[in-house]
Amino acid sequence: MRITVLSGSDSPEREVSLVSGRAVQAALETLGHEVTMVDPGPDLPVRLLENPPDFVWIALHGDKGENGKLQGLLDWLGLPYNGSGVTASAIAMDKVVSKRLFVAEGIPTPAYRVAEAVPQVSECQAWLAALGSPVVVKPADGGSTVGVTIAREAGHLPEAVRLALQYSPQVLIEQYIPGQEITVALLDGLVLPAIEIVPQGRDFYDYEAKYAPGGSRHLIPPNLAADVLKASVDAAYRACRAVGSTGLVRADVRVDPEGRPWVLEVNTLPGMTATSLAPEAAQAAGIDFEQLIQRIIDRSLD
């Protein structure tokens, strides 16, 4: 099968995307597919029209590959691809929209506020009064923890919002949930083993903890009571279903000291690097990396 792998682009997550792309390329070639690597730019529609592949593997991260626009282009061109469709991709990529959906569906998620400009300190004080301290400040449509800050004082919030605004026109100011970080991956609706993420030498699961070797420890199964784990998995499953995701998808959950799960977000194009969580969850379920890649392709073509 002739497969085009899209990786790179000009996203802040470009380097992660390139690593994912190379990992997918190696797996596809091992499986016997003919692979063309494309670093997409403005000429992508023309390139795909002139040399249409049998399948497009999206290994992009960030808004360039996850906000539904690329999915819409591929649908228009009639080219099958991995991951969720236009609507689910757009909802999951926009953290404000997805948070509103979670609230409407009764899915537990941390309280939040939204900023579109650098706030005054008085506004920051009101946020902290409502949300507590600290808060997590993040771009509304970013990933890989790029532009994310934990702010503990009102005076720190303007700079945190200013940083996040470099990556998104909207910024989410979110209640910080202490406790454990859990991620749950689904493969075509099948719940894969949950993973607990324990950052090493860091306050939270930042970019280095995600992608640097040794940046975090992953525990399978998580160190949770059975009923708490079940509640966490159920919340993650409901979030993925609410978004309308398909294929391989991952939901991130915080579990507070009282054992209550809080859904943070849904990722419709999980990373596929050597340290990525979704492939690790698949491996724990007995599905190796090449099998995972082929299964995603086969299901996308059904």
Curated annotation (Swiss-Prot):
Alphabetically ordered keywords of this record: ATP-binding, Cell shape, Cell wall biogenesis/degradation, Cytoplasm, Ligase, Magnesium, Manganese, Metal-binding, Nucleotide-binding, Peptidoglycan synthesis
Disulfide-bonded cysteines: none
Sequence ranges assigned to domain ATP-grasp in this UniProt record: 99-298
Residues that, per the record, bind Mg(2+) 1: 252, 265
Xref: InterPro entries: ATP-grasp, ATP_grasp_subdomain_1, D-Ala_lig_Van_CS, D_ala_D_ala, Dala_Dala_lig_C, Dala_Dala_lig_N, PreATP-grasp_dom_sf
UniProt-annotated location(s): Cytoplasm
Residues binding ATP: 128-183
Gene3D superfamilies: 3.40.50.20, ATP-grasp fold, A domain, ATP-grasp fold, B domain
GO molecular function list: ATP binding; D-alanine-D-alanine ligase activity; metal ion binding
Binding site for Mg(2+) 2: 265, 267
Record's protein name: D-alanine--D-alanine ligase
